[in-house]
Swiss-Prot record:
Molecular function GO labels: rRNA binding; structural constituent of ribosome
Species of provenance: Mycobacterium ulcerans (strain Agy99)
Assigned keywords, A-Z: Ribonucleoprotein, Ribosomal protein, RNA-binding, rRNA-binding
Taxonomic path: Bacteria, Bacillati, Actinomycetota, Actinomycetes, Mycobacteriales
Function: One of the primary rRNA binding proteins, it binds specifically to the 5'-end of 16S ribosomal RNA.
Pfam families: Ribosomal_S17
Protein name: Small ribosomal subunit protein uS17
GO cellular component, one term: cytosolic small ribosomal subunit
Amino acid sequence: MMAEAKTGAKATKSAAAGAADGASKEKGPKHTPSPPKPSGRRKTRIGYVVSDKMQKTIVVELEDRVRHPLYGKIIRTTKKVKVHDEHSAAGIGDRVSLMETRPLSATKRWRLVEILEKAK
């Protein structure tokens, strides 16, 4: 009887240890994997040329409309970006399409895609 009691105790200990091992295997990874990033998507914007004084560079004003978080009023915000214009084709007042690109200089990260509308 003593032998059975000892083996029974060992069996419960080993079962408890096995359950503990099984519980650790059922847990997920130690860290949460990051979601996959969308590849090949560059930002495109439409804006108006405000300066063409630099060589192969234009300054374009981008307009964004944002709703005020508390009052709900639509607010117009503008941002000026420097854009690479290889052929110096755009002039002041032109409506242009831009695309994000790799850094071309200290401040240039956009390139001219096309001139949508010439200034009058």
